[in-house]
C-alpha cells in the first residue's frame, strides 16, 4: 500500500503528521518502514493508541438499554465523559459490572428499526482518534471481539 488520496501512507494508513509523531521501529532494524514491515505497523498503531490513552482491559463499547433524556445527552454527554454510576442513575442498564467511576459517552447507531445504544469507553475514544468515523470504530471493536472470541475457543488463528 503506497498511499491514499488523503495522503495517508503505509499499511496502517498514517497521515504524515501521525507518521512523524507515532511511527516506531517494531522489528529492531533501527528504521521505520510502514510500507513493508508488519512489525513496524503493528508497533506504530499500538503506539498511536497508547498515546491516545488506550487502557488495557478497559471496556470499549457496551451494548445498553436506555431511556435517557436525549436533550441531556446532547448538552452534556457528547462533550465529555460521564461516570458509569451517573449513566445508571439516569436509566442506562447493561449486562455485566464495570467500574462505576469509569467515564463513558453514549452513542446511538441508526438501524433499520430502532437506534442501538452503546456506551463508549476510553478505548473506543482512542480508536476514534485513529479514524474519526464512529462506524469504522465500531467495526474495529466488533472484529477485534470476534477474533478474541475465536482465539479463546481455539477457532481463530493469529
Language-model segments: residues:
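Flexible, glycine-rich surface segments
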Residues: 2-115
Amino acid at each position: 500500500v503506497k498511499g491514499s488520496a488523503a495522503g495517508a501512507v503505509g499499511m496502517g494508513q498514517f497521515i504524515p503528521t501521525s507518521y512523524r509523531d507515532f511511527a516506531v521501529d517494531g522489528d529492531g532494524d533501527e528504521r521505520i518502514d510502514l510500507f513493508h514491515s508488519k512489525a513496524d505497523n503493528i508497533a506504530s498503531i499500538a503506539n498511536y493508541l497508547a498515546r491516545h490513552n488506550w487502557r488495557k482491559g478497559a471496556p470499549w463499547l457496551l451494548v445498553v438499554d436506555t431511556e435517557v433524556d436525549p436533550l441531556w445527552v446532547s448538552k452534556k454527554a457528547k462533550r465529555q465523559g460521564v461516570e458509569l454510576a451517573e449513566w445508571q442513575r439516569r436509566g442506562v442498564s447493561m449486562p455485566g459490572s464495570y467500574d462505576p467511576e469509569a467515564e463513558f459517552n453514549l452513542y446511538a447507531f441508526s438501524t433499520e428499526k430502532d437506534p442501538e445504544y452503546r456506551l463508549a469507553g476510553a478505548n473506543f475514544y482512542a480508536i476514534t482518534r485513529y479514524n474519526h468515523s464512529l462506524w469504522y470504530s465500531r467495526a474495529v471493536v466488533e472484529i477485534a471481539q470476534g477474533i478474541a472470541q475465536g482465539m479463546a475457543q481455539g477457532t481463530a488463528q493469529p
